[in-house]
């Protein structure tokens, strides 16, 4: 796992790396939430972190190729949540505003890239709904492993879709978010959504057209 995550710090490829005391060092030995997240970081290093993140992925792929395992390996690249608020990235000519901790698309709609030479057709793009519970059945299907019937799995495999088959895509997703942080005094948020609508379980039962 590699992260472009707070604290935003120089990477080994950054000029400032040798002269920099990582702000996360301030948290060593911390015993409570405030001590563990007591850092000051600098957004200027976000670009360096993304580039180093990309470099590490490249090294993994190169090693798989050296071991002649590339065509036997499914690589799944996925984000866990939106980018830190305050960070604005570009995707083509479109601005992508960080929305980590929010239940809008900027906080919950994240990248998912699946790559497997010889198995997943190149340039395949899908707009299917996928959530984290779908990874287990997808990976077991890719590995040709059957889950015992005693296991109750909420997820749906999206392996057929990424390999050019029809599959059985989701009609909806259920989302539950509990900030669970003394610094973020916000209520639990629940919603269900499909590709067009999002329904929140708030007092107003807010229905939003996406």
Could you say what each language-model-derived stretch is?
Residues 162, 179-181:
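Segments of small-molecule ligand-sensing domains
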Residues 1-136, 140-153, 189, 197-202:
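Active-site-proximal cap/lid insertion segments
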Residues 143, 162-163:
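A broad structural signal for alpha-helix termini and local helix breaks/kinks
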Residues 208-210:
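Conserved small/polar residues in nucleotide/adenosyl-binding loops
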Residues 185-187, 194:
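Short beta-strand-initiation
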Residues 166-169:
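Basic phosphate/pyrophosphate-binding loop/patch that engages nucleotide-derived ligands
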Residues 158:
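Charged (Asp/Glu and Lys/Arg) segments that form or flank catalytic channels of large polymer-
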Residues 171-175:
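WW-domain-binding short linear motifs
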């Amino acid at each position: 796992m590699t992260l472009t995550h707070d604290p935003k710090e120089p990477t080994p490829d950054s000029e400032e790396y040798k002269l920099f005391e990582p702000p996360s060092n301030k948290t060593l030995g911390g015993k409570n939430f405030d001590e563990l997240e007591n850092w000051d970081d600098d957004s200027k290093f976000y670009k360096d972190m993304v580039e180093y993140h990309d470099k590490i992925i490249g090294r993994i792929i190169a090693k798989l190729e050296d071991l002649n395992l590339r065509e036997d390996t499914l690589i799944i690249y996925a984000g866990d949540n939106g980018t830190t608020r305050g960070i604005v990235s570009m995707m083509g000519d479109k601005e992508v505003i960080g929305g980590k901790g929010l239940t809008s698309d900027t906080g919950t709609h994240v990248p998912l890239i699946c790559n497997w030479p010889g198995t997943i057709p190149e340039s395949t793009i899908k707009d299917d709904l996928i959530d984290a519970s779908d990874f287990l059945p997808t990976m077991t299907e890719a590995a040709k492993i059957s889950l015992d019937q005693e296991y109750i799995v909420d997820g749906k495999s999206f392996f057929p879709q990424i390999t050019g088959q029809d599959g059985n895509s989701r009609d909806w997703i259920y989302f539950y978010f509990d900030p669970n942080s003394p610094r973020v005094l916000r209520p639990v948020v629940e919603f269900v959504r499909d590709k067009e609508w999002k329904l929140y379980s708030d007092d107003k039962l807010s229905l939003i057209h996406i």
